[in-house]
Each structure stands twice: as structure tokens, then as C-alpha cells.
């Protein structure tokens, strides 16, 4: 059925409903249940709901263009089906007295009239629209609402479902125990007013005390189990989010500032887990309490309970609207907070630079500026919260006054006893409080949704370049080929860094890559490590594209050391063995440290290789960090070693030691080495030199060949050798 055909379907449903009410359903159920008119009313109503519900599902299934508001037909048919049975039951059970059974049967006859039929739709449409609107907490398919987020967060507790079930049982038992005080207070009131002595008074008082104490003990046990379980969820969510971030492609970290990522992994995740562990605890507790109170209220006075429930929509509407405002403000606050965190992170991570430029006050002012930008958002957030709390307080007060007035009228008529009214008022006060707490929790839970959406963005995000390769050959030669490679960084897609780059790196050879700054030398190193994918051409290793290799295998065969390597805030031993799937022996660690020139200064520390290097290795000099990073690469015994100005901070003795290792060690005679450098002494000794200019190879050959050619390489050598003014 096309989208424009929905009016025909709606008219058909109206015709079916009219026929059901006129001759069909009343006639059938008058034969099946002739002696019980109230049961007949319920049978007609439920059958009407079921038949129309199937029709609505059919309309929604074949109508494509108007599904948004047509979804409200489902609560509409429910309202139509339940309205008449609900009215009949209310009139029968209310304090105004039971109807005659004939009156119940007369309701069916009245509802089959045309004017009543139209009136039922007029009355049901607003109720259905409200139902459909409030039902947005559980968002339709394709949209993640707060309920979906909550269910997904609880999905992290799949292995702890038994504990959650136990918590729910303890919660229900504890809530039932809390009903003892209002219940026995009502009974005592009746005894006093009737001037009777109750032989079982003491026994009832003891029973009330026992139930109250048991309720407290059960609540304590439930809270303890709940908090332990939520702590498990907290740890798991943090771990899963951080793991998801680590598996993103390298370009992801260029597009997203480190401060923003850190804020999501730490602060946003903590906000969500805090909401689940604290707010959900309160929500479940007051929900269970409210349901128990509602049951006792119905037992005390069905009429007063209906009056109380009819006032609840007024309490729900405004908080629902404020919750949406609160959620949007929460997202904006989190984004603004991430920006201020990024400013602080940049300043703290570059303190030597900040101090060398005497810009401490400038950074502080910039941070204050970011915080000032958050103030309007915080004010709006606070105003929405205060308005919501004030509205609930006034509504609750009006409800209490109304219940006292109506309850007094029922006592005067003899419909309820004074004790029952006292118990009901106590139940109703606690029930209203439970509703108020639930509504006050709702905006804060909406606030956590703003943060959880960001978290699930990371958990659901598929890397643009997934590490899905599977090649892991037993023997690798280390032959590297760049075939017409082009590349632009993801954060600057219109700036071509490499253009038509073609060259070969041979096993057993040291190839030097030289060229001016910005020519793409470090980009070549990044592509060889499979940190990025070329936008054009291929990067082959032993004839296979790098992306085809298993991620862990590739990085045991390819190792790189940069000019400013980062170390982790761990021991020398852990930094050198970083990333290895096996645990190296101390002899292996010492051997590579000696080859890189790191052993001597490491041995000078009191704790030797167990000494912590500080955050990012900031307790070491640049040369010491390079030596440790070089040892970290050498211990892998890679088939391809990439040195990107990796020895520039080493002293002359250690530089010579590294050169002897690369050129004279039998172990390195068959390995491939790419030496990215601006030092002529290192380039001269290389077996082959590639001169890179504007993202492509300008010329290549040995040092002597390039000097004789008199091209770009020779010009650079002469410029570096020329005395400065």
C-alpha cells in the first residue's frame, strides 16, 4: 500500500469498529456470558482492542509515508478498548455504590449509538496522543532513547544477573515491610475512636517492630549487593570504552582532540556509571515502594486511589519537558567541558614551552575564558532543575489537601473508617513522595543520557581502517615497495603530502631517506607502520599490501623509532619489553640495551632496570629516551627497522655503536633498514639514498652518484656545509 492510501485504511478501521460495536461483539458475548453483564463488558472491550490492534499492525506494516503519527493508533485502540470496561468497573467498585447489573449491560447499548461512538473517539484521541508522547522514553526502532541506553548499560552485567534478581527480591520484601507502620497506625486509630481495648495490641506492636527492623536489614543487604554489582559494571564499562578507543584508526586521533577523548573515556564514563549506580538505585527503590503503596492504597479506598492517580499526568508533563531541555543542556555542557580540559591538557603537557615563553598567565586566562563560556549553560541547567522541583512541590501540596477533603467526605458517609483514612493518608503521602523522587531523578537520568550517547558512539564506532588482516608468514624477507603512492592526512584531506611516490627498499640494505622539511619523510614512516592507508597506490611488503598482514604479526616484523619517542610511566624493563606477546629474559633486555647505548645509564640508577622513567619518560634526557626506544625496537628483531632521526640526540659514541650494529653486525646483514635523517654523516654511509621533495622522489642513488649528478641532493649538502653568517 502506498503512503497516500493511509486514509482509506483508517476509514476501513472505523467501519470495522462500528460493525463490531453494533451487531457483532455484543450479540456474541450476550450468548456466551448472559448472567454476568460486567464480564460481558470486559469481553467486548478486550475483543475490540485485540481486533483493532491487529488491524493497526496491518496498516503500519504496509504504510510507508505516515508512520510517525500513525504509531499513535496503537494507544488509541487500547484506550477505546479499555475505556468502557474501566468505567463500568470504577462505578461498581467506587465508594458511591455498585451499579445494577442491568446498568452495565446498558453501557454496551449506549456505546453502540452513533453519538456515543463519536464521543468515545473524541475522548480517546487526547489520551492516546498523551500516551504516545510519554512513551518516547522507550524510543522507536532506529532511535536510541533513555530506556534503550539504560538497558544497554545493564547489558554489561549479563554475568551478574543472579545478583540483580536477588537485589530485586530483597527490595520488594523490604518495601512490603515498610507498609507495617501506616497499616498498624490505622488500626490503632480505630481502636482509640471506638474506645476499645485490643487484647492483641502488644502482639501487633511487636509484629510492627519486627517487620520494620526486617525491612531495614533487607534494605541494607540489598544495597550492599547492589553496590558491589554496580562496581563491577563501572570497571567493565571503563575498560570497554578505552579498548574501543585504542582500536580506532590513527586518523581518528587527528580529528578528535586528546582532551575531548580523555573526557569521554574518564569523566563521561564516570557520569554514566554514577547515574546507573546511584540514580538507578533510588529509582528502583522508590518504584518498588510506590507500587507497594499503590496496592495498599487500592485496598484502603479505590475511589481515593483513582483521584490520586488522575492527578499524576499533571506531575509528569512538565518534568518530561524539562528532562528533554536538561538532556540537551547536558550535551552542551559536556562539549564545553571537553574544550576547557583540552586547554588545560595542552598547557600541562607543554609546561617547558609555556615557561620558556613566560605565558603562564596567558594559559590561565584562556582556561578561565573557556570556563566563563560554560556559565550561561550552567545557569540554564540550574533554572530548569529549580523550576521542575518547585512545580512538583506545589502539585504535591494541592493533591494532599484534596485527598484530605475527599477522604473526610467519605468518612462522614461511612464509606471508609477513620483508621482506614489515616492509613490511606500515610500511604498517599509516601506515595506522593515516591512520585516526586522519581520525577526528580528523571532529569538527572536524562542528563546522563547526554553523556552515555557519546560513550556509545565510541563503542559502536567502526574504524575506517579496521585491523582485519590475517597474513602471518613464517619467513619474511623484508622487501618493501611503494607503488605510485598518494596520501593526504584525514584532518587535511585536500593537502596532498605524497604524490605518485614509487621506490623499493631491499633486504640487507640501509636506505637513507633525506629531503627538506615537509617533504613527506615522516609520512613514509607512518605508512610503513600501517598507521594510515594510502589514498592512492599500494604499499607492499614481500609483495602483499600491508593491510593484509595480521596486526600483531606485522608489528613484530616492523619496528620504528622516532626523533622524540614517547615512553610510558613504567620501569625500564617494561618499556623495553613493551608490546611483546612473550616475556623476554633479563639477558635479552640487557643485550639490546647495550646495543642501543642505554645499559650504562640504566645501570647507574639504584633500582637499575626496575626504575620508573616518569610520565612519558620526562625524567630522562632526549638522548636517553632515544636509546631506550631503540632498545624497544631492537628486542623485536624486526625484518624492517625504521629510524626517523632516531639517533639525533645520542652522543657520538653511541651513534657510532648504532652504525656498527646496522652495517657490520652479521645479525643485521639480511634485514631492511630505512634511515630518515638530516645528518650527512649518516646519509653518506647508506647503501642507497632517496631524496624526497614535495611528496615524490626527486632523485636516488649512492652518495657519490648523487654528488656527481649535481641535483637536489648535492644542493642540500652544499647548503648544509656552507658556513653560516
Curated annotation (Swiss-Prot):
Q: Effect of altering residue 645 to E? A: Increases ATPase activity by 8-fold
Q: Reported effect of changing residue 645 to Q? A: Impairs ATPase activity
Cofactor(s) this protein requires: Mg(2+)
Q: Does the keyword Magnesium apply?
A: yes
Which residue intervals are topologically Cytoplasmic? 1-8, 61-67, 132-163, 226-275, 327-395, 442-725
Positions that bind Mg(2+):
522
Q: Name one GO cellular component term.
A: TAP complex
Write out the ranges of the annotated region (Part of the peptide-binding site): 352-397, 430-464
Q: What is its EC number?
A: 7.4.2.14
- Report how it sits in the membrane: Multi-pass membrane protein
Q: What is the effect of changing residue 678 to H?
A: Increases ATPase activity by 8-fold. Impairs ATPase activity
Keywords of the record? Adaptive immunity, ATP-binding, Endoplasmic reticulum, Immunity, Magnesium, Membrane, Metal-binding, Nucleotide-binding, Peptide transport, Protein transport, Translocase, Transmembrane, Transmembrane helix, Transport
Main role?
Answer: ABC transporter associated with antigen processing. In complex with TAP2 mediates unidirectional translocation of peptide antigens from cytosol to endoplasmic reticulum (ER) for loading onto MHC class I (MHCI) molecules. Uses the chemical energy of ATP to export peptides against the concentration gradient. During the transport cycle alternates between 'inward-facing' state with peptide binding site facing the cytosol to 'outward-facing' state with peptide binding site facing the ER lumen.
State the family it belongs to: Belongs to the ABC transporter superfamily. ABCB family. MHC peptide exporter (TC 3.A.1.209) subfamily.
Name this polypeptide is given? Antigen peptide transporter 1
Q: What is the lineage of its organism?
A: Eukaryota, Metazoa, Chordata, Craniata, Vertebrata
Amino acid at each position: 500500500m502506498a503512503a497516500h492510501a493511509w486514509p482509506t485504511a483508517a476509514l476501513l478501521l472505523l467501519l470495522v469498529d462500528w460493525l463490531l460495536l453494533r451487531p457483532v461483539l455484543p450479540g456474541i458475548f450476550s450468548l456466551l456470558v448472559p448472567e454476568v453483564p460486567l464480564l460481558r463488558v470486559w469481553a467486548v472491550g478486550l475483543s475490540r482492542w485485540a481486533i483493532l490492534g491487529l488491524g493497526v499492525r496491518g496498516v503500519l506494516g504496509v504504510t510507508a509515508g505516515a508512520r510517525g503519527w500513525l504509531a499513535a493508533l496503537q494507544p488509541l485502540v487500547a484506550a477505546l478498548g479499555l475505556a468502557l470496561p474501566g468505567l463500568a468497573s470504577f462505578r461498581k467498585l467506587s465508594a458511591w455504590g455498585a451499579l445494577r447489573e442491568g446498568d452495565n449491560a446498558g453501557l454496551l447499548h449506549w456505546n453502540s449509538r452513533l453519538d456515543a461512538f463519536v464521543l468515545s473517539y473524541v475522548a480517546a484521541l487526547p489520551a492516546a496522543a498523551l500516551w504516545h508522547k510519554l512513551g518516547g522514553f522507550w524510543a522507536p526502532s532506529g532511535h536510541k532513547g533513555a530506556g534503550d541506553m539504560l538497558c544497554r548499560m545493564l547489558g554489561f552485567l549479563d554475568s551478574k544477573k543472579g545478583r540483580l534478581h536477588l537485589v530485586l527480591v530483597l527490595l520488594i520484601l523490604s518495601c512490603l515491610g515498610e507498609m507495617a507502620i501506616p497499616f498498624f497506625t490505622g488500626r490503632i486509630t480505630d481502636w482509640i475512636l471506638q474506645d476499645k481495648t485490643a487484647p492483641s495490641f502488644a502482639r501487633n506492636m511487636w509484629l510492627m517492630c519486627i517487620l520494620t527492623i526486617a525491612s531495614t536489614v533487607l534494605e541494607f543487604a540489598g544495597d550492599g549487593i547492589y553496590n558491589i554489582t554496580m562496581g563491577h559494571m563501572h570497571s567493565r564499562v571503563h575498560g570497554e570504552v578505552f579498548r574501543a578507543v585504542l582500536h580506532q584508526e590513527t586518523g581518528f586521533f587527528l580529528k578528535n582532540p586528546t582532551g575531548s577523548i580523555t573526557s569521554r573515556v574518564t569523566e563521561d564514563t564516570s557520569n554514566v556509571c554514577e547515574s546507573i549506580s546511584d540514580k538507578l538505585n533510588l529509582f528502583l527503590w522508590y518504584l518498588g515502594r510506590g507500587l507497594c503503596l499503590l496496592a495498599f492504597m487500592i485496598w484502603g479506598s479505590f475511589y481515593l486511589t483513582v483521584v490520586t492517580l488522575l492527578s499524576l499526568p499533571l506531575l509528569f508533563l512538565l518534568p518530561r519537558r524539562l528532562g528533554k531541555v536538561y538532556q540537551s543542556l547536558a550535551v552542551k555542557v559536556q562539549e564545553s567541558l571537553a574544550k576547557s580540559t583540552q586547554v588545560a591538557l595542552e598547557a600541562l603537557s607543554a609546561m617547558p614551552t609555556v615557561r620558556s615563553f613566560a605565558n603562564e598567565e596567558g594559559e590561565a586566562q584562556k582556561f578561565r575564558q573557556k570556563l566563563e563560556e560554560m556559565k550561561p549553560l550552567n545557569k540554564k541547567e540550574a533554572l530548569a532543575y529549580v523550576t521542575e522541583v518547585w512545580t512538583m512541590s506545589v502539585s504535591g501540596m494541592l493533591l494532599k489537601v484534596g485527598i484530605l477533603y475527599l477522604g473526610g467526605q467519605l468518612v462522614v458517609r461511612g464509606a471508609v473508617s477513620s483508621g482506614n483514612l489515616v492509613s490511606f493518608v500515610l500511604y498517599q503521602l509516601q506515595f506522593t513522595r515516591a512520585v516526586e523522587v522519581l520525577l526528580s531523578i528523571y532529569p538527572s537520568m536524562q542528563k546522563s543520557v547526554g553523556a552515555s550517547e557519546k560513550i556509545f558512539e565510541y563503542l559502536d564506532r567502526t574504524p575506517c581502517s579496521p585491523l582485519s588482516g590475517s597474513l602471518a608468514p613464517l619467513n619474511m624477507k623484508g622487501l618493501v615497495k611503494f607503488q605510485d603512492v598518494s596520501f593526504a592526512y584525514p584532518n587535511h584531506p585536500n593537502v596532498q603530502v605524497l604524490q605518485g611516490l614509487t621506490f623499493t627498499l631491499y633486504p640487507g640494505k640501509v636506505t637513507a631517506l633525506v629531503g627538506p622539511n615537509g617533504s613527506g619523510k615522516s609520512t613514509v614512516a607512518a605508512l610503513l607502520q600501517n598507521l594510515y592507508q594510502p589514498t592512492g597506490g599500494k604499499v607492499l611488503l614481500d609483495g602483499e599490501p600491508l593491510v593484509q598482514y595480521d596486526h600483531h604479526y606485522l608489528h613484530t616484523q616492523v619496528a620504528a623509532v622516532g626523533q622524540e619517542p614517547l615512553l610510558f610511566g613504567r620501569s625500564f624493563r617494561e618499556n623495553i619489553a613493551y608490546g611483546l606477546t612473550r616475556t623476554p629474559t633479563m639477558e635479552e633486555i640487557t643485550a639490546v640495551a647495550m646495543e642501543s647505548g642505554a645499559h650504562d645509564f640504566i645501570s647507574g640508577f639504584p633500582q637499575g632496570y626496575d626504575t620508573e622513567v616518569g610520565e612519558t619518560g620526562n625524567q630522562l634526557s632526549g638522548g636517553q629516551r632515544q636509546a631506550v626506544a631503540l632498545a624497544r625496537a631492537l628486542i623485536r628483531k624486526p625484518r624492517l627497522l625504521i629510524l626517523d632521526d632516531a639517533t639525533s640526540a645520542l652522543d657520538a659514541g653511541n651513534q657510532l655503536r648504532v652504525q656498527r650494529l646496522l652495517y657490520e653486525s652479521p645479525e643485521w646483514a639480511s634485514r631492511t633498514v630505512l634511515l630518515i635523517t638530516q645528518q650527512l654523516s649518516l646519509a653518506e654511509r647508506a647503501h642507497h639514498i632517496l631524496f624526497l621533495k614535495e611528496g615524490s622522489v626527486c632523485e636516488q642513488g649512492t652518495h657519490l652518484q648523487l654528488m656527481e649528478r649535481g641535483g637536489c641532493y648535492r644542493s642540500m649538502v652544499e647548503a648544509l656545509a656552507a658556513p653560516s653568517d
